[in-house]
Amino acid sequence: MALATVMAANAQKFVFKGSVKTADGKAIQGVVVNNGTDFTTTDAKGQWTLCTDTCVSKFVQISTPADYVLPKSKSIAKGFYVSVGQLVKDKCRHNFVLQPRDTKDNTFYYIAISDPQVKNDKHMELWRSQTVEDLKATTDALSKEHEVVTMTLGDIVWDNMQLFDDYAESIQQLPITAFQCIGNHDFDRRYQALNNMPYGSGVYGEQAYCTHFGPTDYSFNIAGVHVVTLKNINYMGKKGYREQFTEAQLAWLRRDLSYVPKGSMVIINMHAALWNPVEKEGNVLNANDLKSVLRGYRVHIFNGHTHFFHNNTVGNDIYEHNIGAACGAWWRGDVNRCGAPNGYLVVKASADSLTSQYKPTGGDYAQQMRVYSKGEFLSQPYSVVANVWDCDSLTTVEWYEDGQYRGKMTQFTDSDERYLQSRGSHVKECVTTHLFKATPAWGSHKVKVVVKNRFGQVHTETVDVNRAWLKALSSDKRPKVIAHRGYWRYEGAVQNSLSSLRASAQAGVYGSEFDVQITADGEVIVNHDPHLGGLPIAKSTYAQLVKARLGNGEPIPTLAKYLDEAKKHKDLKIILEIKKQANDSVEAVLVRKTLEAVKASGLSSRVQYISFSQFVCDQIIRNDKTADVAYLGGNMSPKEVKEHGFSGIDYSMDVLRVHPEWIDKAHKLGLTVNVWTIATEEHLKFVTTLHPDFITTDIPEDALRMLSKGNNK
């Protein structure tokens, strides 16, 4: 049995031979040839020989020398490799044919494209109509100056191997030589990678990819630059994988680089990031092993996988470009998870230098940042914010206020506002470090942001400080104003008092909000906190609490007295918050007594109920099918709120910053949207840009003044 196994294994080993010549038969000496494990070079006759185990090696390939044209077919890089299956069919011989370059060009353009990730025909159409159309214009222009090489950095498809043909067909008319790198979604999920399958297996995870595009690890030379592509996805099958190089791959790279002089410019392509500090869990596990192999070379590494942009300088000689994806956040919008637009990186390279510039799909090279005016970036409502995606430690981001130089903007980490607004609710948040902020003075008009990158390229953008606010004011969707606990900042008034209710009516707001609690003996009183005069309301009788006074000397109003006062102000809506209680039983009693009081007052048509308690909201609907009820909790989507039969969402600014899409979804479901609590004019300006139906604010008169265009009723 053991002997048979050895014989079977040996039967897979072949001595492959061949040559590397020009079309007219001229031998090319010194060409590096390898089978993924062993290396050789062609002799003076252009001949090569490699003993190859076809259970381990699936290709024999050359590293095309810089003096020869990169072989291709219909724009896809071909001709630099031959499958071992074809070699066996051809009696173990293969002759590579190369074309000498007519002229020597010391510069070339290199376009790095990350994650097309097409899953279906819809995605393929987006790839064709957006990315490929943009690439056509770009490569048509660049190819008039220098040769253009493209590299797709993995996740060409999204677990749909049948789309490899469509991808190849989509770029066949471009004036490029297109190379590919394998990503985790380019494996057939039924199988593990070849290195993890049983020895001699006839199937493996990267088989379909290899059939279309050749070996996963390969190299070539152009304009004095050595270019290497490596698989760094160790695929386990069923979508499982580790970002990792195998020891065999690192050994292959050492052999490959042994033919390249130290100090040379080297480009390395791979799918997963190596040293991305934002999401370290997705980095290659043995990245530092690669680092040691690259010692002594000037290296630029290009990768994707993260769907966001981040540059890293690693020591003095390694620069990692973890670029934004062509599909952005999986074709759900026009931005990546970091806010960088969908696009690709255009690199100008030679043996001595390498410069790069991101090209947004559908945009131009001048679009190297997105600048948010005051009120457009929710977590920074007072600031102008610049998202400068292709930046690094040598990038400077400075600002001018109405023509006056103000210095460097402050870098900070947060989620990009554009991404938060465009992402689906099932796509997780992502933070980025390439955000910069500056706070202009009150009354300023224009802010100019000036970005200078490591290559000396300068980009500027100027914004109107009040852009978002002015746009919102020009809309018919200005929110109605609700006074938070009444207009308590009015002279002589305090929160949740009859005086603050009267002041709300006098100010002309849409509604006045207040809170109710229930005493131990069942009296419903108006108060926000669960304690009054040092006593717990729920455990105290009304008689024990009645002597307490508000800050202006008014007695604590009962709900009945509050509603009696509300009757006098017929144009004022009453926004009644039923506070959460110790348990469902107490809440049920509070709901029943509140509804009875409202019905007795004759104000049912003017009262809108709100509560943080889902149980309270459900009880209101159960007892009064016509009640107008909005949920305050912030933990339910508009769809869930609608399913409960509530009429609106009443959420804080913080909640709606995380889920800005809920506003539009709520409106489409016929729900109203209120945002609370607006305490400053800057917050008011920002929230207005979200187009809610209502705002609850501590500055109702200021809000009315600022929203004075049109009728607020």
Show where each model-derived region lies.
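A short, solvent-exposed loop/turn motif at the edges and junctions
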Residues: N35, C55-S83
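Short, acidic Ser/Thr/Gly-rich low-complexity loop/linker segments typical of extracellular
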Residues: T37-D53, T410-Q411
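Binuclear metal-dependent phosphoesterase catalytic core
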Residues: I318-C391, T395-E401, T433-E461
